[in-house]
């Protein structure tokens, strides 16, 4: 531990060196880095996460990486290099899964130094019904991002964006409709009791792809503005 000029303890040398290395890597690299960190209990959210990853990978100038919460918890420092982190998990009993909560609590070590401050953030979730109180899960992930000082990005997509005529049907948007669940906070999917890969349906998967692409595009704009 070094001491600052005022005699008070300063940051550990190792912490300063790590931050310097990250700063230099940002100066000399030409790719913005996006991480998708997810937990999936039965495989539905895994398909959603992979779709978010595909969407982010479509953006030129983006290096997209995907990690489970277990993998990310084992190597939290890896996320320090990210320009954006997109969090995803299933909704269980109206809340985020225990595995995602465990990751969030492990990542509290980054909160003390605000290491993830000003990184872009996003979130997605899946449940077994149209509602399932999924919004509560997304809000929990949003609050986690705010605790870290991150900048959160929503879907920016109208319900049934590619099939507006579906909004005039009492049955609501079809399985092919983008944002058929109508979420502005983050990407949602409804799998009911259908096993993967039949669920999530095409519209939910394409919504996740579009969301990953949107977050990546905003991340690229943000990193260029900071350069």
Predicted regions and their residues:
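Helix-loop-strand module that forms the ligand-binding subsite of alpha/beta enzymes
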Residues: 70-170
């Amino acid at each position: 531990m070094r001491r600052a000029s005022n005699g008070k303890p300063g940051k550990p040398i190792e912490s300063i060196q790590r931050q310097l290395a990250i700063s230099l890597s940002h100066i000399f690299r030409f790719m913005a880095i996006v991480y998708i960190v997810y937990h999936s209990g039965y495989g539905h959210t895994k398909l959603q996460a992979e779709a978010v990853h595909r969407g982010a990978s479509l953006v030129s100038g983006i290096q997209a990486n995907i990690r489970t919460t277990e993998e990310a918890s084992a190597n939290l420092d890896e996320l320090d290099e990210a320009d954006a982190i997109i969090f995803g998990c299933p909704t269980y009993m109206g809340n985020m899964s225990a595995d995602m909560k465990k990751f969030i609590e492990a990542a509290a070590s980054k909160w003390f130094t605000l290491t993830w401050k000003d990184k872009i953030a996003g979130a997605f979730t899946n449940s077994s019904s149209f509602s399932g109180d999924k919004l509560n899960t997304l809000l929990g992930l949003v609050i986690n991002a705010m605790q870290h000082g991150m900048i959160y990005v929503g879907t920016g997509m109208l319900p049934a964006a590619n099939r507006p005529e579906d909004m005039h049907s009492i049955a609501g948007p079809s399985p092919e409709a983008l944002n058929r669940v109508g979420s502005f906070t983050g990407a949602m999917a409804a799998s009911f009791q259908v096993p993967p890969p039949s669920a999530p349906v095409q519209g939910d998967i394409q919504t996740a792809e579009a969301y990953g692409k949107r977050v990546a595009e905003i991340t690229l704009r943000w990193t260029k503005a900071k350069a």
